[in-house]
């Protein structure tokens, strides 16, 4: 295929091994790679934007090697993509990749994910965009994941990938030889038991540290083929999960299932 102009971002920051592996994998295939990502880790920031302080950027080419132009940005992952598209890039990219995330982005957790938010910002701007994660916080071999991600992205581009559709890719944390297959999946609904650890700082003031434990993974009830596996079950079986996600969150159920609307309070008689 002809070389693509690819923008890469993440939420783990400019020093993360995952984003370097992804950028190198794209470059090896002859694509033109630009990186705009947070200057430090900003995981779980969702689709937040910076409104009360200026955004600052610094060149970071030396972290990625020859041929890759890179910037570290003081903002969120969504800030990075928005700023790249508006100010930093000379041309609109053909493809936006976010990752490789150090840890999973499965099910309803994607609402908290900065990785997914960076890709979603691209989707909102009608650029084909994919979020990429390795489903383990301890896994360090990102080279194989980078190759898998590029294979999938190139195939999707060749197959006329709808720019309004975000692809969320999760790769199991195992050697490539042990990965079984790739399948389309549905988002699961993840339920957590939230735990806050109460601590005391050196000045005697209390603070809280959030932790959480997954207690339930439910298959979503959304529209789509009912025989699709959930993304969580796919990863548990050492299979690659690819989930199509739309930015339109509008509910498409039956009107009769909604609460009744009473207009009497607007102009009471």
From Swiss-Prot:
List of residues binding a divalent metal cation: 11-12, 43, 101
Organism of origin: Prochlorococcus marinus (strain AS9601)
Record carries keyword Ribonucleoprotein: no
GO annotations of cellular component type: cytoplasm
Similarity-based family: Belongs to the SurE nucleotidase family.
PANTHER family assigned to the protein according to its UniProt record, in alphabetical order: 5'-NUCLEOTIDASE SURE, 5'_3'-NUCLEOTIDASE SURE
Gene expressing this chain: surE
Protein name, entry field: 5'-nucleotidase SurE
Catalytic activity: a ribonucleoside 5'-phosphate + H2O = a ribonucleoside + phosphate
Keywords assigned by UniProt, alphabetized: Cytoplasm, Hydrolase, Metal-binding, Nucleotide-binding
Subcellular location: Cytoplasm
InterPro entries, alphabetized: SurE (IPR030048), SurE-like_Pase/nucleotidase (IPR002828), SurE-like_sf (IPR036523)
